[in-house]
């Protein structure tokens, strides 16, 4: 009965076809109807927590806002050197994202115990770690004078290939 009243109210408001009531049986209990509506409601709005879930395709604009702290990457501005992981938020639909990366310590064991893999590039340059312009080679003046060959072939000045095999 309440269902008929609802339909009537919808018609009064110019809402002839309201999908909330479309396949309702009048002999369903109120609880069953409620659960059915709730399911349909969830299906329509999708799971807000998971914008890339199956049921959500097509419900969201193609270009997502960058998800700022999934995986720790802030995706505006330059590279985020603090969180140096290679994961970035997939599925941003053509949006530009900056891939952050870890500047790996390729010199073998450092003399000091500090973990300077996670320094910003500015801090690394203060420590004498400069990033080569074209090549992925780092020279570190705070490690000693031995020039390491970082290509993995292991030819450095002292013929010591202990710490630099195949890092790249």
From Swiss-Prot:
Biased composition range(s): Basic and acidic residues: 8-20, 27-43
Keywords from the named record: Cytoplasm, Stress response
Subcellular location: Cytoplasm
Disulphides: none
Compositionally biased region (Polar residues): 56-81, 120-144
Additional comment: 'De respuesta a estres' means stress response in Spanish.
The name this protein goes by in its record: Protein GRE1
